[in-house]
From Swiss-Prot:
Pathway(s): Glycan metabolism; pectin degradation; 2-dehydro-3-deoxy-D-gluconate from pectin: step 2/5
Protein name per its UniProtKB record: Periplasmic pectate lyase
Signal peptide: 1-19
Gene3D superfamilies named in the record: 1.50.10.20, 2.30.30.880, 3.90.105.40
Superkingdom classification of source: Bacteria
Gene Ontology, cellular component aspect: periplasmic space
Catalyzed reaction equations: Eliminative cleavage of (1->4)-alpha-D-galacturonan to give oligosaccharides with 4-deoxy-alpha-D-galact-4-enuronosyl groups at their non-reducing ends
Entry keyword set: Lyase, Periplasm, Signal
Compartments, as annotated in UniProt: Periplasm
Primary localisation category: periplasm
EC top class, as a word: lyase
């Protein structure tokens, strides 16, 4: 009897605790309502626009501002930096049955097409353009010449096509038109000019160039990713065959220069055209030629090029952002996406083989030819750091866990699994098993609260249906709520000044809820996209801090201000 009473009491306590803790869908619902209320348009009386601020102080409701060098303030509303939120709004409607959230996302898309699409099709968004929510006027840092730029943004084209197919197609054509400087040789650039007349586009002639040919435009993969993704979606939704031809052609440009022995690379398929001379190693303008060759060439020879630098940050673009995007396209495009899957999984296997240190869960900094740069001391100033800087191995974090887990669901390869398993173990998730479902011993007491880990576990669960992975995902989800849900917003640290409305914690929680309900299609696949704003920012002393990024403002705690970055 006593045992029964204790059991009953324990059950009642658990029931009360459960009742006192809102479920994850309720939490996301509360969060989204807070975003729509506090980050909304408070400036236009009875006729507010549907637009949103990028950031908000959860405690006061103050919306995050950009301060221009001339002292003007603007409430930052950059639609390219709200694309995860758009996916959250649609997913929340799908799971809750409340259509108002999806309708708000649709209204935001429609408003941008109506008010901020130029004659060439480009939108006012991206790294150097945004809308001031107070005035509704387009803004941008003047020193960047107000150019168009997307880097790993991955706009929610599925939503955009559903709202206005023609306007979305116009944007994608205009995007390629502005960023491909020379179609014949595939010279691309991260910067595109607004208002350009549309050229031949997909009908343009093309001649394959040798790896790392010299161009003025810089073929950074983070910019190429968005071009590849957009043209592929244009093919998917508008059946423009030429768009897919050019999307795959561009993707292949980053594959052809891979090192023939290792299969590693590349971050760029061109090198900067040398147009001027300098004796100042600290001046890293691309007009002086390839910046890796300037800094590493005397010691490592002609293969030391920017495209071959397998360093922290660059490898995230190649083996996380690009990998997730192309793996998804490969699935979506069926037979037409087979090459994308092969290129991506081949690259991930090469990176696993040559770069991953399982003993301490790090990646080696390398040249694409396999030269290990671990603990290398820079002999001169340059693009990759000041003289004396030591290049160190860097942690294999949960974003890499996600790309390797997702790749394994496409290609069950032992090398891919080895890396996913090793990262999971190092990230406190326990033992994923010698294979999915075999020798599994996950840690259901984990303190891991990383949404990337949650997404990775959901990928493994969807592919294997091993319940342990879903249980572990639920634990990570609980940790996210208990540690990152602060004052009605999600923040990595509770003392941050501003909450980012595009943060991915609610996205991960919605994906978890969808998996638990066996409705994974209700939430858009996670691609690890994110927009940004960058430019000159006025400091408190009146000086201009060049190349300031919005994420630096999001990292400030209450009472902190930006410190000089000493960039020129």
């Amino acid at each position: 009897m006593k045992r029964f009473a204790l059991s009953l009491l324990a059950g009642l306590v658990a029931l009360q605790a459960s009742a006192a803790t809102p479920d994850r869908l309720t939490i996301v619902n509360q969060y989204v309502d807070n975003v729509l209320t506090k980050a909304g348009d408070h400036y236009h009386g009875q006729s507010p626009t549907p637009l949103l601020a990028d950031g908000v102080d959860p405690r006061t409701g103050k919306q995050m501002e950009w301060i221009f060098p001339d002292g003007r303030h603007a409430v930052l509303s950059n639609f390219s930096a709200q694309q995860n939120l758009m996916r959250v709004l649609v997913g929340l409607s799908n799971l809750s049955g409340n259509p108002s959230y999806k309708q708000r996302a649709e209204a935001i898309v429609k408003y941008h097409f109506q008010h901020y699409q130029d004659e060439s099709g480009l939108l006012i968004w991206g790294g150097h353009r945004f809308v001031d929510l107070k005035t509704l006027q387009p803004e941008g840092p003047s020193e960047k010449e107000m150019v168009h730029e997307l880097k790993n943004a991955y706009p929610y084209y599925d939503l955009m096509f559903s709202v206005d197919k023609d306007a979305t197609a116009r944007f994608i054509r205009g995007f390629w038109n502005a960023h491909v400087y020379d179609w014949k040789i595939m010279e691309t650039s991260r910067h595109g000019k607004y208002g350009q007349k549309i050229g031949a586009l997909w009908q343009s002639p093309f001649e394959q160039q040798p790896p790392f040919f010299a161009t003025k435009g810089l073929s950074f993969l983070n910019a190429g990713n968005d071009l590849i993704y957009s043209a592929s979606l244009l093919y998917k939704y508008n059946k423009e065959d030429g768009a897919l031809v050019w999307a795959k052609r561009l993707a292949q440009q980053y594959v052809l220069p891979r090192d023939k022995a290792t299969g590693l690379g590349v971050y760029q398929f061109t090198q900067a055209l040398k147009r001027d001379e300098t004796t100042d190693d600290a001046d890293t303008h691309s007009k002086y030629g390839d910046r890796a060759q300037r800094q590493f060439g005397p010691e490592f020879g002609p293969t030391a090029l920017e495209g071959n630098m397998m360093l922290k940050g660059r490898t995230s673009t190649i083996y996380s952002e690009n990998a997730l995007m192309q793996l998804q396209l490969g699935k979506d495009l069926g037979a037409e996406g087979k090459e994308l899957l092969t290129w991506t999984t081949d690259g991930l296997k090469a990176f696993a083989k040559y770069a991953y240190n399982e003993s301490d869960n790090t990646f080696r900094p390398m040249l694409a030819n396999g030269k290990d740069l671990s603990n290398y001391v820079l002999p001169r100033d340059g693009y990759y750091g000041k003289k004396g800087t030591v290049i160190k191995p860097y942690p294999a974090d949960n974003s890499f866990l996600l790309s390797y887990a997702r790749a394994y669901t496409v290609l069950p390869d032992a090398e891919l699994w080895r890396v996913a398993r090793g990262i999971a173990r190092a990230q406190g998730l326990g033992e994923l098993g010698s294979a999915p479902g075999k020798d599994v011993k996950v840690d259901l007491a984990t303190k891991n609260n990383d949404p990337y880990a949650l997404f990775a576990l959901l990928d493994l669960y969807q592919a294997s249906k091993v319940k342990d992975y879903l249980s572990l995902a639920e634990k990570v989800g609980d940790n996210i709520i208990s540690t990152r849900y602060q004052n009605g917003f999600f923040m990595a640290e509770p003392n941050r000044q501003y909450a980012d409305v595009d943060t991915i914690e609610p996205y991960a929680l919605l994906a978890l809820e969808a998996a638990v309900r066996n409705q994974p299609q209700s939430v858009a696949p996670f691609l690890n996209g994110a927009g940004f704003t960058e430019g000159g920012y006025r400091m408190e002393d009146g000086s201009t801090r060049v190349s300031t990024r919005d994420n630096e403002i999001f990292l400030l705690n209450v009472g902190e201000t930006l410190k000089p970055n000493n960039k020129k």
